[in-house]
Amino acid sequence: MRKLILFILLLQTVFTKAQFTNLNWTFGDSCGIKFNANGIDSIYRTSVNARGSCATISDSLGNLLFYAASPDLELYQTPSLIDRGRIYNKQHDKMDNGDTIFCQNWYREMLILPWPDSVNKFVVVSSMTTPGAKISYSKVDLDYNNGLGKVVNKNVVLDTGEISDGITAIKHGNGRDWWIIYKKWFYTNNTIYKILLTPNGLSSITTQSIGVPSFVGSFYRLIPSKSGEFIIGINPGDGTLEKFSFDRCTGNFSNHSILNNASPNPAYGLWDGATSLNERFLYITTLSTPEYLFQIDLLNPNAFQNKIVIDSIDSLNNPGSGIRLAPNGKMYRSNSWCQNGLYCYPFLDSVFVPVNTHLSVINEPDNFSLACNYIGLGQYLNGFRTYLGLPNDVNLALGPLSGSMCDTLSVGLSEVKDDIPIQVFPNPSTGNFTVNIKHEAMHMYGFTYSIYSIQGLLIQRGELKGKTSSINLTFFESGMYLLNVTLPKQVVQIKLSKL
């Protein structure tokens, strides 16, 4: 019966669903990459000029929709500014109202997520680390400006306090909603913070304490596996490397294990990481001299102690590197460059060297040891340059967790309403519900609605006209019902409680 309900819901919403992808990356000094299944389709110029945080989203065909980045050079040179981020449209111009986004100049401060059950609405989550910091969201609507978009809500604060650089998100087990996950900068803690994004908005914050408390400073990487079944935690400050199982239905962390213990003087400044497509191998970069690229076999009970050195660079000009799994199944490593070990950003116009004009490539990251086929500086960027940061993109292709308790689009956190076009009241009701269409421009149209029982049976269908309409369930049994209202570009689903 659960599958029947899911099937009916899918029939109602399939035409509004859009499969978004990570097929474009925008990063560094003006660099954009479009991927295909086998490699790289093209390399092109963008408006990004940032050493760190960036995020990109594309449609199912690989067409760029928009992107966001931490401060460009002009804003970076104004240290007093804290709202430095920018959002750019697909034509590489600043999006309407896309300036002054809360953000600084770190490396994993930004995320782009599709707004659940919407085709053209998105949320840009951004964070800041230093005193006065916060995590916030800005809502993007691509219905504006002929598809170029507009930021319709900006810098809506979700939480205050110093947010550790390393926010991430994993799709809920229902295949629609998103868990936003982050840690805070406290001297010693093991607290993880979670916010759920649903069609109705963003939930209140929930927290979980798990693992061994350790010093958490301005950097703490949360790196999900491709399936979202586990998360790697990297603490550059004290060298802690840990692994957690993750429940996509409940958002709970469990099965904590320590891969490398904290130390007041860690041997390696663990910096960034990514898991292979088969989720067996973890690749870690360091912020040290020499700088290392390690492969760690997560099936090995002594994984970190038996790590394999894939590459090392013994130079003050190379202080660290970012690493990401790309849509083509390869991994790419940004090789940061610092002139004379000091001037890492911005590059002088004359500084075009192999390290900052190439990405290194792990061609077969699913393979053990040197069979991963690593090629240092193996991908030329066609004259564009890279800094330390690579896109902090999430797995947009992750679907429902089949067979789980939540694959029927049910969630359990209280939700905060955010720009829902339809309001139903009273709800609960003894049977007479009033439906209010909130946007005046929509009052001239009629919209089809359908009501399903909890067993998935269609019990009523009709049309909503004007500002308000009535739905009568007086003669139906008490219980929960699902109201689906078909709007031009989305299906709104509201649970009705009949007393």
Task: Locate predicted features.
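Bacterial Sec-dependent N-terminal signal peptides
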Residues: M1-L23, F230, W271, V411-L413, ...
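Positively charged, low-complexity intrinsically disordered regions
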Residues: K3, T13, G85-I87, E109, ...
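Beta-propeller fold recognition
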Residues: Q19-L259, S263-G412
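N-terminal compositionally biased, intrinsically disordered segments and leader/signal-like regions
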Residues: V14-K17, T207-Q208, G431, V435
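C-terminal outer-membrane/trafficking sorting elements
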Residues: D418-F425, S429-L499
